[in-house]
Amino acid sequence: LRRQRQMCIRDRIAAVQNGKLKEADLDERVGELVDAVMELTSGKKLSDKNFDRNAHHQLARKAAAESMILLKNEKQILPLDTKKSIAVIGDFAFSPRYQGAGSSMVNPTKVEDMSSILQQYDLNILGMTRGYQRNGDVDENDRKFALNLAMNADIVIFCFGLDEISESEGLDRTHMRIPQDQIDLLQDISKVNENIIGILSAGSAIEMPWHTCCKAILHGYLNGQAGASATLDILTGKVNPSGRLAETYPISYEQTPAFRYYPSNEKTSEYRESVYVGYRYYDTSKVRVQYPFGFGLSYTEFTYSDLIIEEDGIKVSVTNTCLLYTSPSPRDAH
């Protein structure tokens, strides 16, 4: 984010220097902004800072845990077996992507990261490392250490996703992939350890050709200041995941209806799908997707039957098909 701000400032300075932007016009725009700030804050009492910060943090933790989406859980690798050794790999475990960039940013009272709170959970942590760099640089020594750590662990928790440069306001994404260095490391880890739990952080839909590398995928989106403890609450079985996707995840960018018309060569953007936006397009065109709108697993399994669709709603019978999930049961180490 700091890099984006610096680039924006440099662009404005360069525009003034080369004559593309008049300094008087820039002064006028800044003046309008200052006037708006003064008008909105004049005579208003500042918000009370004497609030229960811990209670607010716990509320953020609860909201994050109830929002996270379990996309995959092969062979019930989750919740974690506390007896198995675990390697935690990924820059996002140390520097979480907990909120959006630009004007959506707010000041948290505190921010958790997974690496700092793991000791609060009854887990057998073999080791932790970044493995990849947030800015795309490659540290070969750390990468080798990550692969060696993964090779010697029973389970790998891999924290990855879109960084702040990949998605923000004021710019359009040029593709739907996560950074390639993260994918490369994930694929290499999968060659030495098949028990990978992917912890995904991203603010929008992405391509997931690498999903076969993971036995489980837990998607946190941008899960706030208490996202790390919320994630571990789900991984350890303290919370049963219940979140659902609010958008469709296509298999590839080429499946999206705007693919042929983006980026636009004109001054306007074309939305030729009309009312068939989002899930409406995929449902209508019968396109097979990676994960559909509304998808989400839990540690409990259900069946649906007797579906009745009426003008004012839907009726359906839901049957629990396994033992009601309350907490992870003890397992023998293998």
Q: Which ranges hold each PLM region?
A:
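Hydrophobic helix-and-loop "lid/oligomerization" segment in the mid-to-C-terminal part
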Residues: 51-52, 125-212
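Acidic active-site catalytic centers that drive phospho-/nucleotidyl reactions
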Residues: 154, 320, 332
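Single conserved hydrophobic/aromatic residue that forms the stacking wall/gate
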Residues: 1-5, 9, 325-334
